[in-house]
């Protein structure tokens, strides 16, 4: 009896190992093909969810596939994270193993771009920029009524807190700006409504009017971070600690020839629309 149990365990272990090996091969093949289709500088990370893999492969249907590429460039941003979750993917086994994606199609794709605060700060000339979610008190006192909170369902507007250290009247000083991020037609507009010194409380007015206005203009900016993966139209924006996330959803997406125009921009560093109301980053 013991020998039978051991034999069964060995068979199960070998089956699991074979399943993981097959999944790893398929993920590698898919990553290589997606690198070509999206014209990425390196293979993205690909994870095929669900177990066992071989059952999904034989059926030619996958519940969900996660794709992530890091360090993408759309000038002047140089450290974008591109992410996508592909749901209900139909992919014949022969195409998965051969790398041919002609018939591969996803029922739904959730695509997103993650803009890191360090990357955005370099682009607008604020090297130590930190992006955070504002407190409930800041949202209530400083932003218009009806502004969504950080816990609200993601929409086309989100509150943002921007912290930076700058030269102010000859001294290195921490400043805090609170405002709104709005997503319109794929363009991310950051409008700072209030700015204060880091040592001041919420709503404090401790800055001269001219300096305050200059800081408001310096922190407000407009960014168009390219198209989302798989030609997904961006419809939602929100703030996480350290980044701004732009997301959208598309239905019935073919993975053959996906988003070639935006992919070329990632590879060739096409110009990105980024403007600020003020180019001044040092204040006297």
Which ranges hold each PLM region?
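Hydrophobic membrane-targeting and insertion signals
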Residues: 1-58, 71-76, 256-284
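Short secondary-structure junctions
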Residues: 37-43, 126, 227-231
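Hydrophobic membrane/lipid-contacting segments
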Residues: 87-94, 149-209, 244, 249-250
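A short, surface-exposed beta-strand/turn
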Residues: 82-92, 177-186, 261-284
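N-terminal beta-strand/beta-hairpin edge segment
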Residues: 41-121, 125-168
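Extracytoplasmic/luminal low-complexity segments enriched in Pro/Gly and acidic/polar residues
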Residues: 191-284
